[in-house]
Design a protein with these regions (language model features):
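C-terminal alpha-helical "lid/dimerization" subdomain adjacent to the S-adenosyl-L-methionine
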Residues: 270-315, 319-321
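Conserved beta-strand edge residues that scaffold enzyme active sites
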Residues: 77-79, 278, 325-327
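Core SAM-dependent methyltransferase catalytic element
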Residues: 317-336
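Conserved adenosyl
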Residues: 93-283, 329-330, 336
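Conserved Class I S-adenosyl-L-methionine-dependent methyltransferase catalytic core
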Residues: 2, 8-42, 48-49, 54-172
Length: 336
């Protein structure tokens, strides 16, 4: 990324960051990185393949080359730079799904309500759309699929670090609570052939999970259950993973979810919260901006270690360990 020591230029680039975000979103939505996977192409050829206006697509591509996502060669040709490779659908840790989701109109509009959130403490998404994210998506299958694809992308990226940091071999049955379409559970079951798994999420989300588990070759060890974690979750397992779930909720609902899990788990069981942990002042940009994302969209928050302890206590759980898993922490909790 180009840097400049002039603070006026640096702040201007930060202010205009939304333009880069939207440009990446458009390129991801058009599948530009996949079209460049085999090598360089001209802007005209890419426009023909994407059904876009060639001179305008060229303007988008050269802007992306200026921030080192693409590289522009002679004759309006473009190839992927290392950052752009991350936008291919087929790379490990692909961010294509996340980029397609994050700039989509409904989500984008909700971020326009950040000022409202800061003034009132209220959820911007609800303010802008008149519905919470979950009911909004439940009635819009395309947007729901876009979100699930984004979550799958993030889950895949987190899986390797989680498996390296956490010994899943000690468990008999793992329930992935709010596990989306099953990317994380599939990775855990693949790494541990002796393990049984249960994927639990909203019925319309897990509807797509059977085929996913089949493709991953773990369907004989993965049970799929639809429901709401405010009512009940599958009983009797010795590990309950919740990745990026409690950060969607405020403390009242967070305690409700954890209490449901606590009620269901085996006496010797544990809960593994896979979440960003808020760092001390001036550190940890990713968690602190993710916290704003939680404020704006689902209405939740990222938490410090102490805030996780305060959330777990009323649910009858206590922190046994906090394990570093790269961008995330694993907060391992057991019954009191
Ligand atoms: C931020 S996503 C994380 C998904 C997945 N754990 C991951 O890491 O990719 C939160 C998940 O919670 C699920 N969820 C939301 N409300 C739910 C409810 N009441 N009961 C069960 N799952 C719910 C959503 O469908 C979504 O899959």
């Amino acid at each position: 990324m180009q840097s400049d020591s002039n603070p006026a230029i640096t702040i201007r680039r930060l202010i205009d960051g939304y333009q880069v975000s939207q440009a990446i979103h458009v390129a991801a939505t058009l599948g530009i990185a996949d079209l460049l996977a085999k090598g360089s192409r001209t802007a005209d050829a890419l426009a023909a393949d994407t059904g876009t206006h060639a001179p305008t697509l060229y303007r988008l591509l050269r802007a992306l080359a200026s921030v080192e996502i693409l590289r522009e060669g002679n004759g309006r040709t473009f190839e992927l730079a290392p950052l752009g490779q991350q936008l291919r659908a087929d790379t490990a840790g692909s961010m294509a799904g996340w980029a397609a989701f994050i700039g989509s109109p409904g989500y984008w509009q909700a971020w326009g309500g950040l000022l409202h959130s800061v003034r009132t403490g209220e959820n911007a998404f609800q303010h802008v759309h008149g519905a919470d994210v979950w009911s909004y998506r439940a009635s819009r299958p395309e947007e729901s699929a876009l979100f699930d694809r984004a979550m799958t992308a993030l889950s895949r990226q987190a899986s390797a670090a989680l498996l390296a940091a956490c010994d899943f071999g000690r468990f008999r049955t793992v329930v992935d609570v709010g596990g989306g379409t099953g990317a994380l559970l599939a990775a855990v079951l693949t790494a541990h052939p002796g393990l049984q798994g249960i994927l639990f999420d909203q019925p319309h989300v897990v509807a797509a999970a059977g085929a996913f588990m089949q493709r991953a070759g773990v369907s004989d060890r993965a049970r799929i259950v639809g429901g709401s974690f405010f009512d009940e979750v599958p009983e009797g397992a010795d590990a309950y993973v919740l990745r990026s779930v409690v950060h969607d909720w405020d403390d009242v609902d967070g305690v409700r979810i954890l209490a449901t899990v606590r009620k269901a788990m085996a006496a010797d069981g544990c809960v593994l919260l896979v979440e960003r942990v808020i760092a001390p002042p001036n550190e940890g940009r990713d968690a602190k901006f993710s916290d704003l994302n939680m404020l704006v969209a689902p209405g939740g928050r990222e938490r410090t270690r102490e805030e996780f302890e305060a959330l777990l206590g009323p649910a009858g759980l206590r922190v046994a360990a906090v394990i570093d898993a790269g961008a995330f922490g694993v907060i391992e909790a057991v019954t009191r």
